[in-house]
């Protein structure tokens, strides 16, 4: 519950009004044909994708609670693909609580940039617009390693268990996150 929220669309639209450019948007994450149509007519296309925690307080795509995979919600991969197929200057903005697998689109030749904003808060719009317009240079540091495949991570989603609360023995010791990748010779998509 924010006292106010500045969305990326609001902030980018305000910047566009200042410099005389035009913003056309689609707020549907499932209408990939419309997104591609808008993108085809634009000089630059910005695609926002997300994945939240769940934590039992919401249900998304039939999943109540924690994420059950490392994919963008609402078929975000298809949305990015459709927009990138239509626009040679596509920027992907990712709002997510943790890593998602980006392999479906990260090597697309029209994806020119990725802005990984994580959970930017009530000033989300201004922070993303500042980066996109070059007012600030993002740090380029991630708080975690992003893999190329969910199988690259040591722990997998436990879909079923006979135990009320599964036992976790943490046998990996200090080999968590980037240490796991280094120790096992796994090349991540984006390093910690």
Swiss-Prot record:
Family, per entry: Belongs to the glycosyl hydrolase 3 family.
Known catalytic reactions: Hydrolysis of terminal, non-reducing beta-D-glucosyl residues with release of beta-D-glucose
Keyword vocabulary terms for this entry: Carbohydrate metabolism, Cellulose degradation, Glycosidase, Hydrolase, Polysaccharide degradation
GO molecular function, one term: beta-glucosidase activity
Keyword NAD tagged: no
Signal peptide (UniProt feature, chain positions): none
Pfam families to which the protein is assigned, alphabetical: Glyco_hydro_3_C
Protein's name according to its UniProt entry: Beta-glucosidase
Presence of keyword Hydrolase: yes
Biological process per Gene Ontology, one example term: cellulose catabolic process
Organism in which the protein naturally occurs: Schizophyllum commune (Split gill fungus)
EC number: 3.2.1.21
Pathway annotation: Glycan metabolism; cellulose degradation
């Amino acid at each position: 519950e924010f006292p106010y929220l500045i969305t990326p669309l609001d902030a980018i639209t305000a910047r566009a009004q200042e410099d005389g450019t035009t913003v056309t948007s689609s707020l549907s994450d499932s209408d990939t044909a419309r997104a591609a149509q808008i993108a085809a007519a634009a000089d630059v296309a910005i695609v926002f994708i997300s994945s939240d925690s769940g934590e039992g307080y919401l249900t998304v795509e039939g999943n109540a609670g924690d994420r059950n995979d490392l994919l963008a919600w609402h078929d975000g991969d298809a949305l990015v693909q459709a927009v990138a197929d239509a626009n040679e200057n596509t920027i992907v903005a990712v709002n997510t609580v943790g890593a998602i697998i980006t392999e479906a689109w990260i090597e697309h030749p029209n994806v020119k940039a990725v802005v990984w904003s994580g959970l930017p808060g009530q000033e989300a719009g201004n922070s993303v617009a500042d980066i996109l317009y070059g007012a600030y240079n993002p740090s380029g540091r991630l708080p975690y390693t992003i893999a190329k495949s969910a199988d690259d991570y040591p722990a997998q989603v436990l879909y079923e268990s006979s135990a009320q609360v599964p036992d976790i023995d943490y046998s990996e010791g200090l080999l968590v996150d980037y240490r796991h990748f280094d120790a096992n010779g796994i090349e991540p998509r984006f390093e910690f």
